[in-house]
């Protein structure tokens, strides 16, 4: 949503609107802006976060999260998602796009397949103690993100007055369309 190093906010809705009719889900890495940016509300189908950064807030545990918004029609173009739309022999020939809604009542075949197949194949589930540590940070992520943004704005204001500083990169310091996207997508900080 807000990639390094130039902090040019990604055009979430615009890209999602191009892909959806073609059966292409928009997957966003929102590690840099949890709470501030809500990609699912703007048309993203899947959102990822590194839990180690802002969400955990302390760097004691390595982890990640994938959120399936349940808002994407995985049947729109079945050929684009063969892993979801063709029989999975490792699960008795289950077709994820058909089985998941029947079992869960939700349109989340991507994240269910990710959870059961990828975790089975890689053995990468989060340990209970690490989950507990991340939850400790999650409790205050909203407050911390607000303070991070407030502090960043103060640093930007200070740096802009320094003669030895040639350029300050900050999402709302850009001009035109890039600034408009920052104001549109980055709220809550």
Residue spans for each PLM region:
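Conserved PLP-enzyme active-site core in the AAT-like
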Residues: 1-161, 169
């Amino acid at each position: 949503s807000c990639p390094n190093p130039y902090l040019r906010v990604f055009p979430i809705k615009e890209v999602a609107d191009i892909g959806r009719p073609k059966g292409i889900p928009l997957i966003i890495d929102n590690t840099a802006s949890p709470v501030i940016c809500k990609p699912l509300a703007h048309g993203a189908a899947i959102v990822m976060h590194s839990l180690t950064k802002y969400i955990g807030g302390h760097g004691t545990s390595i982890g990640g999260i994938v959120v399936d918004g349940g808002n994407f029609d995985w049947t729109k173009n079945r050929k684009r998602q063969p892993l979801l739309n063709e029989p999975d022999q490792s699960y008795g020939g289950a077709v994820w796009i058909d089985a998941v809604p029947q079992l869960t009542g939700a349109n989340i075949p991507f994240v269910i397949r990710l959870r059961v197949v990828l975790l089975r194949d890689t053995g990468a589930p989060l340990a209970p103690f690490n989950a507990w540590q991340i939850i400790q940070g999650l409790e205050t992520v909203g407050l911390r993100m607000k303070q991070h943004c407030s502090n960043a704005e103060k640093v930007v204001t200070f740096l802009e007055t320094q003669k030895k500083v040639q350029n300050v990169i900050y999402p709302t310091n850009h001009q035109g369309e890039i600034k408009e996207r920052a104001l549109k997508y980055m709220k809550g900080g």
